Amino acid sequence: MKIFKNFIGLAALALCLGFASCGSDDDAPSYSNVAVSNSEMMTILKAKGYQFDENGKMLLDDKANSTSSLDLSGTKVDTAALKELSVFPNLKELNLSSNGYGETFDFSVLPAQITGIDLTNNDIYNYDNLVKVTVEENGDETVEPLHNITKLYLPEKAKYNIAQIMRFYRQNKSAIDGGTMDVEMQNGNGSLEKYNTLREIPNETLRECLKENYAELFSGDKINILNSATL
């Protein structure tokens, strides 16, 4: 009987230790699978209150897990570092306004989960890897989205872009008009307006000459770049 009681006691002790071990595992901090290796991005994120271990992996606490939108405006962060934002499990939107970006923004640097991006107050003209355009022998175009963007805020210079932005707009016009996609562009005053394809031609002589020869391209006194792209 004494041996049996000792056995029961040892079994109970082992069971308690097992529960304690499981509890300690559940309470252990969780970190991202990959590390943030870019020192500039690491500094920015630490300043915003995110924590990292000695290997650069981010602590997945309530703050990190609840982050669905991240404001990196004015940080001048290198676009090459944006891929590292995949450490956020629920990040969907990025504010990259006023970062001094010029000429070209490459959408391939964005983590796959990003669906919204603010690029206002930058000097971006080209938008690489937003769409893939395939032109058939008969001139027909197939436009394939390369990133699942449903919210896009553009700087004023985007109004001159036909190669990517206009085609992105044309491909998604019904969704934009229906309100399931939000695409806006800054006007000359810096305010955001719903994206459209009407463009002013300030030079009156040139405008009248174009209207005389290409009347089908115009809506009032403005040229419609959507029409010009179909010629």
At which residue positions do the language-model features occur?
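Short "repeat-start/strand-capping" segments in structured domains, especially the N-termini
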Residues: 90, 112-113
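Bacterial N-terminal signal peptides that target proteins for export
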Residues: 1-9
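Right-handed parallel beta-helix
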Residues: 99-101, 111
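C-terminal motif of bacterial Sec signal peptides marking the signal peptidase cleavage site
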Residues: 17-21
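N-terminal capping/linker segments that flank leucine-rich repeat
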Residues: 2, 22-93, 123, 134-135, ...
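Low-complexity, polar/charged sequence tracts that form flexible coils or short amphipathic helices
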Residues: 85-86, 108-110
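Alpha-helical adaptor scaffolds
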Residues: 95-97
